[in-house]
């Protein structure tokens, strides 16, 4: 809206006798009508200008930042031991302080049941050497797992990790997997978030994930939390909070201090951040990474200072990955 402008022009008086010479009072137009004729336009002008100022002030208060994705830092609540040989690809929390984890690497891929407090592997199902384990989720009594560079997935019994069956999905590849208790969410390393029928594994819907105008590529491990899908962004220290209904990023979680802390402590063999688990009952959030010796319970804190596009792009956005090792 245009800014207020001060009115500086006024009509010039003509130097003729009718204007310059005062009229006898009895010959002048009624002064009441003259006052009304002057006051009414001024009143209307002031009203319009004043309303414009109020409207401009009100509208101006709603900037891009008010509808921008929130940015969150983290506080470490607790640290737990984690197998430093586990190339974490999928992670989830079950009841009674139990975690399920899918690990990758050729010849080392597995599905495992892990005690949260001790990090001890309580049960383990090794995968055939031809498969590279990827995302994992729990629906009912069954664990669903996808594999890298293939459209093959597996279903396991959650109690003893025995394999039920294989399935074939329609994604380009298998990276991440999560569920809301009804359908599956999947990623294939692109910017696409899939909604998958858990009975026939057909794609029910899909959304391209975007941060403002930018596609968010390399979507990796997933977790469903309070109506949102949270995704690790491969090769970054960021988690994207995604609205699965339209693909919009509604928040960023910045976790770079975890990896930096491990490196400072001498753990130089670690790989990238990967693995999100949510304890819905106790509202606890856990994260870890590939070959990390620790698993963390974290708490989120909104970052109040403004983050511009450049900072988020540098920290969280990556170039598309051409289906290499996730």
Question: What are the functions of these language-model segments?
Answer:
Residues 114-119, 157-161, 198-201, 243-247, ...:
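Short loop/turn segments that connect beta-strands within beta-propeller blades
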Residues 75-112, 124-137, 175-176, 289-294:
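Beta-strand-rich domains and repeat architectures in extracellular enzymes and scaffolds
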Residues 83-95, 129-142, 170-184, 213-228, ...:
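Beta-rich, blade/repeat-based domains predominating
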Residues 272-326:
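Blade-level signature of beta-propeller repeat domains, shared across WD40, Kelch, NHL, RCC1
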Residues 62-86, 115-123, 265:
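A short helix->beta-strand "capping" segment at the edge of beta-propeller domains
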Residues 1-32:
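Short, low-complexity, Lys/Arg-enriched N-terminal segments of secretory-pathway carbohydrate enzymes
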Residues 99-106, 143-151, 184-190, 231-235, ...:
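Conserved beta-strand positions in repeat-built beta-propeller and related beta-rich domains
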Residues 117-156, 161-171:
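Blade-loop segments of beta-propeller domains
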